[in-house]
Structure formats: C-alpha cells, structure tokens
Design a protein with these regions (language model features):
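Glycine-rich FAD pyrophosphate-binding loop
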Residues: 292-312
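The AdoMet/dcAdoMet-binding core of the Class I SAM-like
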Residues: 50-171, 190
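A conserved short coil-to-beta-strand element within the FAD-binding core of flavoproteins
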Residues: 433-449
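Dinucleotide-binding Rossmann-like beta1-alpha1 core, especially the glycine-rich loop
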Residues: 315-396
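A short glycine-rich, Lys/Arg-flanked "PGG" loop and its adjoining helix->strand segment in the class I
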Residues: 189-202
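Class I SAM-dependent methyltransferase Rossmann-like catalytic core
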Residues: 2-7, 11-57, 68-80
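N-terminal Rossmann-like FAD-binding beta1-loop-alpha1 element of flavoenzymes
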Residues: 271-299
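Helix-loop-beta segment of a Rossmann-like dinucleotide-binding subdomain
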Residues: 113-116, 324-325, 350-360, 390-425
Length: 451
C-alpha cells in the first residue's frame, strides 16, 4: 500500500504534513482521549453493566490516526476483566501511519505499553479496505478500514433494513475524531453522518472534540439528540449525542439478495453446549472461536483425534486466490487472506510451519495478463504482494524458472495442519469424543439437534 501518511515530529508529537495538524494533543493527549470519548460516553459504567446476553460492545471511530483512542479503550476494557465479553472496534483511516511512525507515537505513552506492544507485534501489512486484527486472545477485535470513512462504513450497511432488523449489531458508541472539519471535510460530511445514523440504535451514543455548528445541525437532522458541554483543557466546548430510536431515515438503495434480507439471526444462550462434528482444521478453528465467546464446546470425530483425514497435511500452503475483477467475493478473499497471514503468525513462531513467502507462477499467457490486472487492481497493496519479473523473480525463487513473472506474497507460507489442530485443542481445553455422528435428529421445539 502506498498511501501512508507523510509525517514529521513537532513539539513532542507527530504532525501531518497533508492536513497541517497534529495527530494528538501536544500535551496530555491521553487525558483528553479519556475525557472526550470514554467519560462523555460513560463507557466504564456501561461496560460494567453489560447484560448477560450481550457478549460484545461495538465502537465506531472516524479517524484512527495513531490509534491512541483505541489503545486507551483497549487498556480500560482489559482492566475490567469482563468474562466472555468482546470489545469490537471499527475505525476508518484514509492515510494510515507507517509502522515506524506508529511506534514513535506510542512511545510517548508509557502507560499504554502493554496494549501497544501487542498491537504493534500483530500489526499486519495493511491492505486497502478491511484489515481484521485480533488481540488478547480474542478479547479485543480491531477492524481497521483503510478507506474514506463514507465508503468504509457504507459497506457495513446490509440492506434497506435499519440496524434494528438487520443482522448487523448496531454500534454502541461513535468517536468522531478526524482532523478538524476545516482541514478534512470528508470526515464530517452529511453523507457520512447519515451512515453513522443508519448504523445506530436507541442505545447508541456519540462524542466529538468538535462543536462546529454544522456538525451539530447535521447530527440533529439525522436523528441524534445533541448536547454541548465543556471541552477538554482550554477548549471551550465539545459535543455529545444520543440516537433517537424513532428517527425515519431514507431507504438504502443497495439491497442484498432476498436470502440475506430475510435472514434473522439466531440468538444463543451463553454457556450453551455446542458439538462440532469433525476434527479437521475448520472444525478446530470453529471450536476455538466459539470457546472464546463463552460456549461449552466438544469436538466429535470418528477417529477420536484431530487432523486425521484431509487436514492431515503436514505441508499445507496458505495459497492466495485473488481476482482482477471487482466483486464481494474478491474482496472477501483478500480480507480472509490478510487475516489468515496474521492469524497464523503465532503458529509459525511455534514452528508449526514456516512463513517463507509464497510465489505464484502463471500457467499461460492468459494468466500472465490476469496477474498483471490483479497487480493493477491492488496496486496500493504492494506491501502484501508484488508482481515480480525475471531477475528479481529468479532471486526470490532461488532457481531458474521458465515463467517471466509471478505474484510474490512475503507474509504467506506453509503450515503443519496436524500440529496446529493439536495445539489449538490443547490450549483451549476442548474435549474430543470418538464417535460417528449417527442418528442426528432436529428438535424443532428447542431449535437444536440431538446426536
């Protein structure tokens, strides 16, 4: 990706050359973050009083910047040690900081070292669009959207349904923290704020350091009750807001297929027993994901062990399947590939394979053209993969090749699936029952299966 922010150090913090403004307050930025966003949204109290049937709290931020608000929330959330609850944090950033710049900025906040170190250690090669980062064993999930905020958040709007009937859980809280409206108007546009409203519900709150009259007016027009309060430090004022449940927003004009529109999410009770049939890589990863969310999990496998059949591959390549065409499936493949390269990093460190990179070669002239088009389409993501030619290609491969070009993915590699599966069930203490899944019976009255 080549749209990283141009920065320089000024007065003890990072300064944006493009927006001619500081990424954080020149003094006491952490206290400002706590005051403007945590305190004014009453987050600590809301987190402590989360209902038993609500397993996640979702924050949306416009303007991730150096991630100080995220780290501050992350630290406070972890200190509360809420069992089987997740903090899910969506943030947009059009021009992200380079990793080295992020390290410099975080270095000014020693109290955030523990959370900062984990973020920096798992910080992926960013790609345009959605970048999913899981921290602290799934207790915190960050979705960093590298795009204009209006474009990024619009992709979370499923259909004509509003957040109360859609299967997307509405945001609990919004942080509006882009560069000032005069310097970066797209981060405060009426179109963006309409999307913020569409992704909100009657329990949603919002805060911003800005108290601009246009911002107040636009929020009010989109269904928010807006209040002005004292700003942090020497700032005269800021705003807080809460969403009104009865506000009528215009229908969204990009509905999904009928089968998605009619979908109603199933609500599970916590501590429910779930049996995963099959102990392959998919079964093990699903079991772990559900275990992290507080369910009692058992794996049922006819061999009484994991990774015996198709997942018994000791040299499985994390293989990319990208497309030169723009589609939801192509975007999903890129997101999944980037997430997988980050997710398996831990296992590579445990010697369950090797992150040696993956080089994909074309099999025909047609595929060469496809590779070229893929490179053009994802041209901003050269840190994640690169189209190589001739001498460079030969140097990476370490041998002579007949192909004249190839797509190289430096963060991919090969994996020992049996080792990974065994490590997962051991780490998360997931029992395995040796049995075939005979006699499955659906109990309609209980919406469950009998094995």
């Amino acid at each position: 990706m080549n749209n990283y922010a141009e920065t320089e150090l000024r007065e003890g913090t990072l300064f944006s050359k493009k927006y001619n403004d500081y990424y954080s307050s020149k003094k006491d930025a952490l206290s400002e973050s706590t005051y403007v966003f945590l305190e004014k949204n009453n987050l600590i109290q809301r987190w402590l009083n989360l209902p038993e049937n609500k397993d996640l709290f979702t924050i949306g931020e416009v303007g991730f910047g150096g991630g100080i608000n995220f780290l501050n929330c992350c630290k406070k959330w972890l200190e509360l040690d809420l069992k089987n609850k997740r903090l899910v944090y969506f943030a947009t950033e059009k021009m992200p900081l380079k990793l080295d710049d992020m390290k410099i900025l975080h270095g000014f906040y020693e109290s955030l070292n523990a959370v900062s170190n984990q973020l920096l250690d798992t910080y992926p090669k960013l790609t345009e669009g959605f970048n999913l980062i899981e921290l602290f064993n799934g207790k915190v999930q960050l979705c960093l959207i590298i795009d204009d905020a209006e474009i990024g958040f619009s992709q979370l709007i499923q259909s004509k349904q509003n957040s109360n009937t859609s299967y997307f859980e509405s945001f609990d809280c919004w942080f509006l923290d882009g560069f000032s409206p005069n310097l970066n108007p797209s981060a405060w546009s009426s179109n963006l704020l309409e999307q913020v409203a569409r992704l909100s519900s009657k329990h949603t709150t919002l805060s911003s350091f800005s108290a601009a009259s246009k911002l107040q007016k636009t929020l009010a027009e989109n269904g928010f009750n807006v209040s002005i309060c004292k700003g942090f430090g020497g700032k005269r004022s800021m705003i807080t807001a809460s969403y009104k449940d009865n506000h009528n927003i215009s229908p969204y004009v990009n509905p999904l297929g009928w089968h998605v529109e009619k979908y109603t999410p199933t609500r599970f009770k916590k501590k429910q027993n779930i049996t995963i049939i099959g102990g392959g890589i998919t079964g093990c990863l699903t079991a772990v994901a559900l275990k992290k969310r507080g369910f009692n999990i058992t794996i049922l496998d006819q061999h009484g062990d994991v990774a015996i059949e198709a997942s018994g591959n000791n040299r499985a390549v994390l293989y990319p399947r990208l497309s030169a065409h723009s589609s939801s499936l192509a975007d999903l493949n890129m997101i999944a590939l980037q997430f997988a390269s980050n997710y398996y990093k831990k296992f590579w460190e445990e010697e369950c394979g090797q992150q040696c990179g993956v080089l994909v070669l074309p099999k025909s002239n047609t595929e060469e053209k496809i590779f070229h088009n893929i490179s053009l389409r994802y041209g901003r993501n050269e840190n994640f993969f690169e189209l190589l030619y001739n001498k460079t290609l030969k140097k990476i491969a370490g041998l002579n090749l007949s192909a004249e070009c190839g797509l190289f993915f430096p963060t991919l590699g090969w994996l020992s699936i049996p080792k990974i599966c065994k490590n997962l069930v051991k780490e998360f203490d997931i029992p395995i029952i040796s049995s075939k899944a005979d006699g499955l019976k659906f109990i309609a009255s209980e919406n469950s299966w009998e094995i």
